[in-house]
Amino acid sequence: IIYYESSRGCPFSCSYCLSSIDKKLRFRDLELVKKELQFFIDHKVPQVKFVDRTFNCKHDHAMTVWRYIKEHDNGITNFHFEVAADVLKDDEIELISDMRPGLIQLEIGVQSTNIDTITEIHRKMDFKKVVDIVTRINAGHNIHQHLDLIAGLPYEDLESFKQSFQDVYEVRPEQL
């Protein structure tokens, strides 16, 4: 696995996350990113895990990278992205839905569906929209999605965590 960063920082201010400390978002030059990705593709690296905190926070950046890996797919390399599902745009969904099965996988941080918890941790998320987007992507049967929860957040007890688990489980991600 290659851990790879095409941007640094996060546009969100979730109180539990260390990424919220750095308020600046910085993006690497896309020509350099493409050159480095091509090196990984040429060398048939099995997986490139983007560690960008919210890969799709800048639409043009995400689209350029996703187009590039689609156009240069070697049939082997898999790319992993952490995304905010509720801010994915229709053209992004269309692009990734047309990729070969296994080319990309998405990690979607839900953290909790408890509204008191979400409010307390300053998490901006529309869970209904997350459900809609995850369901749309699942329909294509080509993208592995895993959705994350965090146990122990403020206002989260065992019962509310069970509810968050059930809410996410019902969406049927490949991994929870």
What are the functions of these language-model segments?
Residues 45, 173-176:
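Proline-aspartate-enriched helix->loop->beta-strand connector
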Residues 72, 171-174:
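Phosphate/oxyanion-binding loops and surfaces in catalytic or ligand/nucleic-acid-binding neighborhoods
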Residues 92-96, 154-170:
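Catalytic cores of alpha/beta
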Residues 145-147:
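Internal alpha/beta domain cores that form substrate/cofactor-binding pockets in large enzymes
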